[in-house]
Amino acid sequence: MKKTLREIAEYLGGTVSGDGEVLIGGLATLDDAGEGTLTFLANPKYAAKVATTKASAVLMGTGGNTHGKNAIFHPNPYLAFAKLLTLFYTAPAKPVGVLPGAFVADGVKLGADVSVYPGASIGAGAVIGDRVVLHPGVVLYPGVVVGNDVTLHANVSVRERCRIGNRVTIHDGTVIGSDGFGYAPDGASYYKIPQIGIVIIEDDVEIGSNCVIDRAALEATRIRRGTKIDNLVQIAHNVVIGEDCIIVSQVGISGSTQLGNHVTLGGQVGVAGHIKIGDNVMIGAKSGVAGNVEPNQVLSGIPVMPHRDWLRSAGIAPKLPEMKKTLSALEKRVAELEAKLAKGE
């Protein structure tokens, strides 16, 4: 598929600079672009590459330096490029129906245009919406409810009675609804607390590969609308994550913690249990959150503190060995002076 630069600009709501009739047949990065491709500039640190890229045109922020290249100006070039990927990329065709080798138990309700690949298994009483795709190895336990336009990639498991909303994508190897980590000490060992709740994944959520979201002990672990979860994330039982949150890889969230809306947790953040994090909070990578966090803050560190304070503390840390030597020398000198004063010298 080829489109003129002007057609692409009209599709995006952008403005053409240069030859609007140049044909674009693909998309590429600044470094790898060639003739007939469109590239994009979203991060100013790469602005110098616009002068050297071999792309036929560049998508960039309004008023950017084109270095004489054909361009589309757009107020949000990153978002615009994402939309172009959808326009230029054609997803592989998928078969419709239950393919040989898939297992569908009695009492399952399948919506229209469902694709169930070989090796997928759907338990009794499950309800599957329209245009759902279940890739090989997907296992839906009895009583699972899946909304419309959902894609579950290979080897995703959704345990009994859990509920998946509309337009949800879950990537390979993720487990939804495994038992929460709950044990009661009995004096000699530990008694397993039955985890009889569920997990609810609301609409427009995307979950990466090899994540685990544990079922609640009694009610529901809930991931609210629009949240995006990276790979290798652990979410414990009874956690509630608000709308439009970003949870980056290797985050661990302990049981019964609640996140507000628009919360961002950087990679490897650890969050203690039974706490609340307010709306619009950003937590830097590798931080430890041990207590409640008020809304509208940017925090980092272990334990978390205002991000600017953490940067100052981190800058001091490499100097601590030398500072210790200096402090020891000062302490020794003060002790010598005090001894002289005591002798009346």
Swiss-Prot record:
Q: Which UniProt keywords apply?
A: Acyltransferase, Lipid A biosynthesis, Lipid biosynthesis, Lipid metabolism, Repeat, Transferase
Family label: Belongs to the transferase hexapeptide repeat family. LpxD subfamily.
Q: Which GO terms describe its biological process?
A: lipid A biosynthetic process
Q: Which reaction does it catalyse?
A: a UDP-3-O-[(3R)-3-hydroxyacyl]-alpha-D-glucosamine + a (3R)-hydroxyacyl-[ACP] = a UDP-2-N,3-O-bis[(3R)-3-hydroxyacyl]-alpha-D-glucosamine + holo-[ACP] + H(+)
What interactions and quaternary structure are annotated? Homotrimer.
Q: What is this protein called?
A: UDP-3-O-acylglucosamine N-acyltransferase
Q: Which residues form the active site?
A: 237
Q: Give the superkingdom in one word.
A: Bacteria
Task: State which pathway it belongs to.
Answer: Bacterial outer membrane biogenesis; LPS lipid A biosynthesis
The protein's role, per its UniProt record: Catalyzes the N-acylation of UDP-3-O-acylglucosamine using 3-hydroxyacyl-ACP as the acyl donor. Is involved in the biosynthesis of lipid A, a phosphorylated glycolipid that anchors the lipopolysaccharide to the outer membrane of the cell.
Its Gene Ontology molecular function terms?
N-acyltransferase activity
Fetch the Pfam families from UniProt. Hexapep (PF00132), Hexapep_2 (PF14602), LpxD (PF04613)
Q: What is its EC number?
A: 2.3.1.191
